[in-house]
Amino acid sequence: MKQNEISQKNSEFWSELCGSQLAKAIGVTDSSPASLRKFDDWYFEFYPYLFDHIPFSDLKGMNVLEVGLGYGTVSQLIAASGANYTGLDIAEGPVAMVNHRLEQQALSGVAVQGSILSPPFEAETFDKIIAIGCLHHTGDLAEAISRCYRLLRPGGSLIFMVYYSYSYRRWLQAPKKTLRYLMDEIQGKRSVIGVAESKDRAAYDTNSSGESAPHTDWISKKSLSVLCQEFSTFQPTLENIDSTPPFQRWTRSQLLKTRIPSLMGLDLYATATKS
């Protein structure tokens, strides 16, 4: 697909809030304060390591841009921390949810609809950019990271998560593609795995109709470091694991305490700082 087609499909697909199916599963049926609190409590319990990557307590007074808003859980906590919050999402649904949360909680900030590939902001506007599980869906991960770099002030940092190319899930579900990617990297090539069948994408993201996300990239630490070479520092960390084959004998909580996520976890978190 061409980039404009990917962006259009992303705008349509992600307008259904990421987390909608989960919300229904835990009994969240509206956007009242109590319902959103229930969702948020579940979310942070499921992803406890988010607090290791996002310095919520240090964001007060900072200009913070969040890219990819989902159900607005992270958005609300950023705004509540005292940051000067701005949210950006390519889809209408998440933008509406975050603005609803901000108004409902009497928090300052605003969410706007747009693409990080052509962001509606001036260069060197933000102290922090936070993008959890978003940039790998844009269709151009390299350009998305480059745009973030330009939007950051000197000394600012990009905190983001993308899907890891060598996770246990990729080795199990797409072994040939993963091995081919590994061989390419051994030969010095640095890139993403960006061409994937619908079933591969569906293993990570689907909507309520069972449709997979329009585009998904997977990337290694080495290749991601190259995409972040404009930054002065780059610190990657692997996280996340599911209690699914071959780990179905253990609970997810048990698995998170093992070394498996740090060796071949599903998600690649990184903090890149601009000098």
Can you name each region flagged by the protein language model?
Residues 34-62:
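Conserved alpha-helix/loop element of class I SAM-dependent methyltransferases that forms part
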Residues 1-36:
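N-terminal, positively charged/glycine-rich alpha-helical extensions of SAM-dependent methyltransferases
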